[in-house]
């Protein structure tokens, strides 16, 4: 599939949206993907302080993309390629970027000063930030619990050269913070200690759930997400026309809603990476929301395809007869 890079025309700048709590269900449920109706310092140099949007995988300048992909710049390649394999065109429109959280500089020193029974990681970005601090702290021996397979993949390369010092030892039966907190194994005969490096905007399910079970939990807000500072208006118009918006975090949902706040008629389909994002999308008023039972790339693509199918059915009156 041909790759098209559109020239950047006028730029739309916008301020961060008002914060809103993140974290489902609805009157319409399907078995595979459940539709739910109803300027900080960058963490790494690869994140620029002023981000503009770019497009990918749109076959021609006059084509309407089928899906908008919205993860931060540099992290959309996997989903774009997976969609291409299924013949689905996409438009890359990064809505958020990661920035340092208030506890970013403390993480390495905490790892140096104290050992923990568990390190709990609930997102790929939290994993990447942790690995940087872990290396700075001279790579102490740690046992990792992750929320799902996508997060676990962040540690694969590091574990190959860690000589057993870094070990992913736990994944819950369902990829949510509540289930992780209810299933994390305890140390026999002692109070288990947990280090939880998290996003500033992450909810409290893990801390509350583990604390109720008697775990000692240290939470460090090591990173946060902020909206990109500018969006190309040409790309935004293309995005508004796309049948499906794909989102991977509640922050991306909020950024999109702030960006389109003057587009009262927008009611297209939303494909979320998992239940937490879908719950946030529903609470924020979006309809036609789809998500996979198990978060991850494969399930996300299936949800996108299901959303595209639902859009096609809604656009074809004869299909409903």
Curated annotation (Swiss-Prot):
- Alphabetical UniProt keywords: Chlorophyll biosynthesis, Chloroplast, Lyase, Plastid, Porphyrin biosynthesis, Transit peptide
Q: Which reaction does it catalyse?
A: hydroxymethylbilane = uroporphyrinogen III + H2O
Q: What does the UniProt record say this protein does?
A: Catalyzes cyclization of the linear tetrapyrrole, hydroxymethylbilane, to the macrocyclic uroporphyrinogen III, a precursor of tetrapyrroles such as chlorophyll, heme and phycobilins.
Give the GO biological process terms: chlorophyll biosynthetic process; protoporphyrinogen IX biosynthetic process; uroporphyrinogen III biosynthetic process
Assigned protein family: Belongs to the uroporphyrinogen-III synthase family.
Q: Transit peptide positions?
A: 1-81
Protein species of origin: Arabidopsis thaliana (Mouse-ear cress)
Q: Which pathway, metabolic or otherwise, does it act in?
A: Porphyrin-containing compound metabolism; protoporphyrin-IX biosynthesis; coproporphyrinogen-III from 5-aminolevulinate: step 3/4; Porphyrin-containing compound metabolism; chlorophyll biosynthesis
Q: What is this protein called?
A: Uroporphyrinogen-III synthase, chloroplastic
Which cysteines does the record link by disulfide bonds? none
Write out the annotated subcellular location. Plastid, Chloroplast
Q: EC no.?
A: 4.2.1.75
Q: Which domain of life is it from?
A: Eukaryota
Q: Which PANTHER family match?
A: UROPORPHYRINOGEN-III SYNTHASE, CHLOROPLASTIC
Q: What is its main location?
A: plastid
Q: Name one GO molecular function term.
A: uroporphyrinogen-III synthase activity
InterPro entries linked to this entry: 4pyrrol_syn_uPrphyn_synt_sf, 4pyrrol_synth_uPrphyn_synth, UROS/Hem4
Q: Which GO terms describe its cellular component?
A: chloroplast; peroxisome
Coiled-coil parts of chain: none
């Amino acid at each position: 599939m041909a790759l098209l890079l559109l020239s950047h025309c006028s730029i739309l700048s916008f301020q961060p949206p008002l914060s809103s709590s993140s974290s489902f269900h609805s009157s319409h449920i399907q078995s595979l993907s459940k539709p739910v109706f109803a300027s900080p310092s960058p963490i790494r140099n690869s994140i620029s302080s002023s981000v503009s949007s770019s497009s990918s995988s749109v076959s021609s300048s006059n084509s309407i993309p089928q899906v908008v992909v919205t993860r931060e710049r540099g992290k959309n390649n996997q989903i774009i390629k997976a969609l291409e394999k299924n013949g689905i065109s996409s438009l890359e429109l990064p809505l958020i970027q990661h920035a340092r959280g208030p506890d970013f500089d403390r993480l390495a020193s905490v790892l140096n000063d104290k050992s923990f029974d568990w390190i709990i990681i609930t997102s790929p970005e939290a994993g990447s930030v942790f690995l940087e601090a872990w290396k700075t702290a001279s790579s102490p021996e740690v046992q990792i619990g992750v929320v799902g397979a996508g997060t676990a993949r962040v540690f694969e390369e590091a574990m190959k050269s860690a000589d057993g010092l870094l070990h992913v030892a736990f994944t819950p039966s369902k990829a949510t913070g509540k289930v992780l907190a209810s299933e994390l194994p305890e140390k026999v005969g002692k109070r288990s200690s947990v280090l939880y490096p998290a996003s500033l905007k992450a909810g409290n399910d893990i801390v509350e759930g583990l604390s109720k079970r008697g775990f000692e939990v240290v939470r460090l807000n090591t990173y946060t997400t902020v909206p990109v500072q500018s969006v190309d208006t040409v790309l935004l118009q293309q995005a508004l026309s796309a049948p499906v918006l794909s989102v991977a975090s509640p922050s991306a949902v909020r950024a999109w809603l702030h960006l389109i706040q003057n587009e009262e008629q927008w009611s297209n389909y939303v494909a979320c990476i998992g239940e937490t994002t879908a719950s946030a999308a529903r609470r924020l008023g979006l309809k036609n929301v789809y998500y996979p039972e198990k978060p991850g790339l494969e399930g996300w693509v299936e949800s996108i395809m299901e959303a595209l199918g639902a859009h096609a059915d809604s656009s074809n009156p004869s299909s409903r007869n």
